[in-house]
Amino acid sequence: MSSDQVLERFMKNGLMNAELKEFFEKALVNEGFSTMELRMQETPIKIILKVAKPHEAIGEKKFRLRQFQHLAAQRLEVPDESVEIVVEKVHEKGLCALIQANFIREKILGGVQYRRAVNMALKTARHAKAQGCQIIVSGKLKGQRAKSVKFQDGVLIHSGDAVKDYINTGYATVETKQGVIGIQVRIMLPYDPEGVLGPNYPLPDRITILEPSEIQ
């Protein structure tokens, strides 16, 4: 396979991954969609979805799951039986930025004042043991002039290799009578030695002091 063919295949797989992620993000917004992982190298092709409400995402008698399987197979240009969709439950939705962004969106659509909705999301992230949470709400929040308001609780890192593993980012938009409001949520995950709730490696500046008995 030539380098041009490899590049074309890589770009095609990336495009399919982005399109499928966008589809599931919209289709499962009420079920608390978190992430999607596409494993093209496996047989059958495996799509792993993480949601807050897996039972609702699967549907009664797996009806919705079969629908998703058919639509995904069409996009991947393979038979239905060549695609397997696995739905997993999010371990802690308070640590998922996308779920929190959509939570704020739903609250605003329900008539809740945006500051109150943001504070509720910050509290949820704090209770989930997040190291920090930053929420930016932009648009015509009050009056005719658009503005951005930033809320932050705890600490967040902004540079270094650890950002890609420790910072979880999610976006949502709300259409109101005044215009479109944008919501950006950034959550700094906790250090988790088991790698379930957060990265299994500590930050470079983390210092561990050993007891004298542990020093050889």
From Swiss-Prot:
GO CC, any one term: nucleus
Keywords from the named record: Ribonucleoprotein, Ribosomal protein, RNA-binding
Family: Belongs to the universal ribosomal protein uS3 family.
Signal peptide range: none
NCBIfam families: uS3_euk_arch (TIGR01008)
Pfam family, one: Ribosomal_S3_C
Organism: Encephalitozoon cuniculi (strain GB-M1)
GO biological process: translation
InterPro entries, A to Z: KH_dom-like_a/b, KH_sf_prok-type, Ribosomal_S3_C_sf, Ribosomal_uS3_C, Ribosomal_uS3_CS, Ribosomal_uS3_euk/arc
Name of the protein in its database record: Small ribosomal subunit protein uS3
